[in-house]
From Swiss-Prot:
Gene3D superfamilies: 1.20.1250.10
Alphabetical UniProt keywords: Antiviral defense, Cytokine, Glycoprotein, Growth regulation, Secreted, Signal
Name the UniProt record assigns to this protein: Interferon gamma
GO MF annotations in UniProt: cytokine activity; type II interferon receptor binding
Keyword hit for tRNA-binding: no
Residues spanning the membrane: none
Protein family (similarity comment): Belongs to the type II (or gamma) interferon family.
Signal peptide: 1-19
Function: Produced by lymphocytes activated by specific antigens or mitogens. IFN-gamma, in addition to having antiviral activity, has important immunoregulatory functions. It is a potent activator of macrophages, it has antiproliferative effects on transformed cells and it can potentiate the antiviral and antitumor effects of the type I interferons.
UniProt gene name: IFNG
Length: 164
């Protein structure tokens, strides 16, 4: 399977995994549309396989459902951006775009989380002002790492109090 085929396979997985039930998603039509999209991009070209998949590989490190929602929201946005630069008058492109927009609406929280991660990566950790602020935050960060989530804690406290 070529890199482009892998990427379009990921697109199919995203569409199935989030926001759609079997009755609301016509997989046969979607696969046909993706095949037409592959033809539009000439994805059978020999250079597509060079270096392996570019999107599927990124998904391997994201294991939890909430983690996957973050990365998948970015992937959906990438596909929408890719389709913005194509001929939107073609029915198959319009259909894929509509499905992706629906998925994007279901994954809208991921963009904010990715922005937070990028903002953290941009912090100048050699800046004394950043050091001061980070030192003030350190105990709170460590507490969040040590303390169980409040919902689990509340449930376990309730079970201890209950004399069932």
């Amino acid at each position: 399977m070529t890199c482009q085929t892998y990427n379009l396979f990921v697109l199919s997985v995203i569409m199935i995994y989030y926001g759609h039930t079997a009755s609301s998603l016509n997989l046969v039509q979607l696969q046909d549309d993706i095949d037409k999209l592959k033809a539009d991009f000439n994805s059978s070209h020999s250079d597509v396989a060079d270096g392996g998949p570019i999107i599927v590989e990124k998904l391997k490190n994201w294991t939890e459902r909430n983690e996957k929602r973050i990365i998948l929201s970015q992937i959906v946005s990438m596909y929408l951006e890719m389709l913005e630069n194509t001929d939107k008058s073609k029915p198959h492109i319009k259909h894929i775009s509509e499905e992706l927009y629906t998925l994007k609406n279901n994954l809208n929280d991921g963009t904010k989380k990715v922005k937070d991660i990028m903002d953290l990566a941009k912090l100048q950790m050699n800046d004394l002002r950043i050091h001061r602020k980070a030192a003030n935050d350190l105990f709170s960060v460590l507490q969040k790492l040590v303390d169980p989530p409040s919902s689990k804690r509340k449930r376990s406290q309730c079970l201890r109090r209950c004399s069932c």
